[in-house]
C-alpha cells in the first residue's frame, strides 16, 4: 500500500516538521511494515510554470518531426515575454495549456535545463511530459496537456504536487483495513495521540424503494449490497489533475473519470466499488453462484468459463461480473466514445473465502480481490457509495438519483470477554485497566465492565477474534520496545526421544556417506504418479488434497519423497552440478480409510482430551520416510584412479546404512516397482512382529522415467519407511564382538537357479554357520553354459572366529559344511566343483 504523506495529512494533523521517515518510525513501532519512504521530487528545482502555446512552426529537413513553439509563461521567466522552445511532441495544439520548465531548473535525474541551440534554433526551456517530471508514463505518448482553467504562469511544482513523500507499506493478511488511507490514518492518529478525521463519516440517505432493484440469492456470499444511481454525467469530463496525481502516487494509473473516482474511494475508504453503465444493464442486479460452464468476458477482454463455486453479479441476461474480483466487459463504462451518461454504483460486501477462491481459480488478482480476501469493513459500503456519488456530482456534473438500494443480511457484532489483566499476564507487564480500556477504544472497540471486560470489536477488524488478539493490540500500541528483556526459567529438559535420536543419527550417517540434505516442500501434483508409471490402484495415488493449495499444479500432500528430490537433482544438474548425491528425511501423508471432519479447537481455553483425540483422529497418517537420489560420479577420477559412476548398488548401500543406524537387519531381494528399472530394483524388507514387511525400494530408475523427468542417465534412488525401520529395531544397537584370536576364512562357490535371490542364499549360510561366523561377503557372481541352463554361481567368503580360542581347521570346515547344507536345503544350492 502506497500512502502519499500529503494525502495522509488530510485526516491527521501531523506536525508540519514531521517527515516521512518520522511517520515511518512511528508506524513501525506500532507494528506495521513500512518498507521504505520514497522521496518524490527531492532533486527537482524550478522554475516550472503553466504555459499557453501561442504559435507552432513545423521545422522541416530533419529525420523526425520537429516543432518550434512560442509559449506564454506569464511572469515566470521574469520578463513576461513569450518563451521560444523546440519540441518534438505532436499531441498539443495552439492554445493548449502545457507545463514548461525554464532555464536554470533541474529535473529528476539531475537533468539541468539551459538555453541551447538545437535543430537550427535556440530552445529556451522545455515542454514537459509526465515521465520527465517523475510522474511516470501517463499513457498519452506525449507532453502533459493541462485543463484550460489553469492560469498561465502558475507554479507547476505545486499544481502537480511534484514534491511529496510516499510510504510504501507491506500490509500483512490480517491487517486488511490498512489497505486504505482511512486505516493508515487511524494507525497514525493512534501512534501520535492525535484525533482522526474519519472520511467515512458522511451523511448517507436512508434506503428506499426507488433505487435500482437488487436481488441476492446467495446471502452467505454477499451479506450487504448498496446500489446508487447518478444521472446526467458529462461524458467529456476528465479527471482533474489532483485526482490523477493521487492515484499515480498511490500506484494506480488514471483511466476515466468514473473509474478513477471508484479507485480513489477504494484507496480512501478501503471499500472496492464498481460502476456500471446503466444503459447496458437489463433488469435487476443479482448476486448468485454461477452455473457450471457459464461464460463471462471480464474487463481485461478474456472470456472465462465459470465454475459452480464462483460468486457472480448478474442482470436478466446472465453474469455481468465476478463478485469482488472484476466486472464484465458488457456493462463497462464507455470511455472511448464517451456515451455513458448514467451509472449505477455498486458497493457490496462479499465473502472473503469465495472471492479468494474465485481469484485463484481464474488466476485473476485485482485490487478489489486483494482487499476482499483480507477483510473489508461491511459498514463502509453505504459511505463509500455516497462518497462516489458526491465526487461524480462534483466532477462530472451529474445528479444523484433519489433512489437508494441497500440489501442487508443482519449480523450481530462480534464480542469478546476478556479479563482486564489479561494483557498484563501475556506481556508480563502491569498495564492496568485504564490503559487496556484506552488502547482498545483507540482501535475502535466499545468496552464495558470492570474486572471482566466485554469488548465489541469494530467492523473493520475481523482479525480480532479472541482475548489474545486484544492483548496483542494493547501490547503493540504500548510499544514492543518497552517490554522488559527477561530470561525465562525453562523446566529441566528430558532430552531427545529415541525416535529423535534415530532421525539425527540417520541424517549424520547419510551426510557422512557423502550425501547432501535437500529438504523440499511437501506438495505434489497427481500427474507425477503417471510419470512414475504407478498402477492405477497403487496406494500412493491416494492423496490428501488441500482445500487452499499454494499452487494449482501441486494441490496434494506427498505420499513419496522422490518427486521433490528428483526435482532438486534435475535443477542442480541443469545448472552444471552433474555429480550429485542428495537425501531427505520427512513426512509423507496417507488419508485414513475413514474420513473425518476435523473439529475446530477453542482458543479461549485449553482443549479437552476428547477434542484433541477427535482432531488427531481426523489427521492423515504421517509416517517419516528417508530417501536418497544419485547421479554422475560417485568417486571422482584423478591421478589416484579412474573413479567410478554412481549406480544402484550405492542406493542399496544407503538403505543398509540406515538399517545399521537403527540396529535392524535389512532383507534385500530382487523387486519390481515403479519408478525403478525392473531388472535393477531391490525390495527392502524387515521382520516386524514375526512377519516380513516391505518398507521400501532401491535401485536404478526406469529409462522411461528418466526421459520423462529430464534426469541424467543411470540415476538411482532409494526410499524407505523410517518409522517401520525403527519399529523393527531391537532398541539398543549391539556392538560387534571383538576377539583377539586369529580369523579362519573359508570360501564357498554355490550353484543355484538364476531366480534365487542372493539374499536368500546369504541368510541360509549365515544361519547354518552358527555363532562362529563373524562375517559373510559375496565376492563373485558367475554365469556360464558349463553351469547348466538357468544357473549361476555365487561365491562367498566366510570369516570364522571364536572369542575364547583359536579355531582349528576342522571347526571352521564343520561350520562351513553346516552353512552349505542349510543353503542346499532351502535354496537348492550345490557346491560348485
Curated annotation (Swiss-Prot):
It comes from the Bacteria. InterPro entries: aa-tRNA-synth_II/BPL/LPL (IPR045864), B3/B4_tRNA-bd (IPR005146), DNA-bd_dom_put_sf (IPR009061), Fdx_antiC-bd (IPR005121), Fdx_antiC-bd_sf (IPR036690), NA-bd_OB-fold (IPR012340), Phe-tRNA-ligase_IIc_bsu (IPR045060), Phe-tRNA-ligase_IIc_bsu_bact (IPR004532). Keywords: Aminoacyl-tRNA synthetase, ATP-binding, Cytoplasm, Ligase, Magnesium, Metal-binding, Nucleotide-binding, Protein biosynthesis, RNA-binding, tRNA-binding. One of its GO terms (molecular function) is phenylalanine-tRNA ligase activity. Its main location: cytoplasm. One of its GO terms (biological process) is phenylalanyl-tRNA aminoacylation. This is Phenylalanine--tRNA ligase beta subunit. It comes from Streptomyces avermitilis (strain ATCC 31267 / DSM 46492 / JCM 5070 / NBRC 14893 / NCIMB 12804 / NRRL 8165 / MA-4680). The gene is pheT.
